[in-house]
A protein has these predicted regions:
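Class I S-adenosyl-L-methionine
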Residues: 1-109, 114
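Structural recognition of alpha->loop->beta junctions
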Residues: 26-27, 95-102, 126, 208-217
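Short secondary-structure transition/capping segments
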Residues: 43-44, 63-64, 116-120, 136-137, ...
């Protein structure tokens, strides 16, 4: 059995209880060493075999899973954040399907949630934004033409940009090219959300590249953009005294 487990954004206590239990029971752990907090490996039993997938190819990862399965053991494939976002799990699951090896998925707290917590922010504010776009800048891995950053930026929605801080100048240019964001639109860069070395840089779209460079951030950071970082919004209807819900009547009813 293979368990795909989300490690959370960084802090060891942000892994789910199920994820922690699976780590404690695993015969083998293959973890994304470039991003997963190694403190989580302290949950492993002494005889557990541990592999750092940052040093491995897909084929090598699969070979380890097959060997453990053949021996009757269980493997935890430990991914950063939530595996469903930029986790490259589909190719692993397809290979396991082909081999007849059972697997399941345990979700984790994504780093985009960790970034919101670091900012003490809400991505979806009434009258400001009810949409969150999660994307990345094109680099060595291409993105579909219809998903170019400038095209997505045209919506002016809350945007969370993964895997792109090393291309910060291109990110800034694309955000402005979309037409909905202005140089004054609030933005932030969150480095290693929830880790002890977490750093939050608040800026605007116009100062995004310069602020990122000034703070020496070149990797392991999320870029967030949108008016949700500003001060304007309207009160939620859900808790308005005049609003009727299934559970209470509004004051004017």
């Amino acid at each position: 059995m293979v368990h795909f487990v989300g490690a959370g954004p960084g802090a060891p206590d942000l892994i789910t209880r199920r994820g922690a239990a699976l780590l404690q029971e695993a015969d083998c752990i293959i973890y994304a060493g470039s991003l997963v907090n190694p403190a989580l490996l302290g949950l492993a039993k002494p005889e557990c075999a541990v592999y750092n997938s940052a040093e491995m190819t897909l084929e090598q990862v699969l070979d380890v899973m097959r060997r453990v399965e053949a021996a009757g053991g269980t493997t935890v494939r430990l991914h950063t954040g939530d595996p469903c976002l930029y986790g490259a799990i589909r190719e692993q699951m397809d290979a396991l399907d082909a081999d007849g090896i059972p697997y399941d998925d345990t979700p984790g707290v994504s780093s985009f949630c960790g970034a919101a917590a670091a900012l003490n922010a809400e991505y979806t504010l009434p009258t400001i934004s009810q949409t969150v776009i999660i994307t990345r800048m094109e680099g060595r891995t291409p993105v579909p033409e219809k998903e170019k950053l400038a095209s997505l930026a045209a919506h002016g929605a809350t945007m969370v940009i993964f895997l792109s801080v090393g291309l910060i100048d291109k990110v800034q240019q694309a955000l402005l090219a979309g037409g909905a964001y202005t140089p004054e639109t609030p933005a932030a860069v969150v480095y290693k959300a929830s880790w002890p070395e977490q750093k939050v840089v608040r800026c605007t779209v116009g100062t995004l590249a310069g602020s990122t460079r000034t703070n020496g951030i070149t990797k392991t950071a999320l870029i967030v953009v949108g008016e949700f970082l500003g001060t304007r919004y309207e009160r939620s209807k859900l808790y308005d005294p005049t609003f009727t819900t299934e559970f209470r009547k509004g004051a004017d009813q």
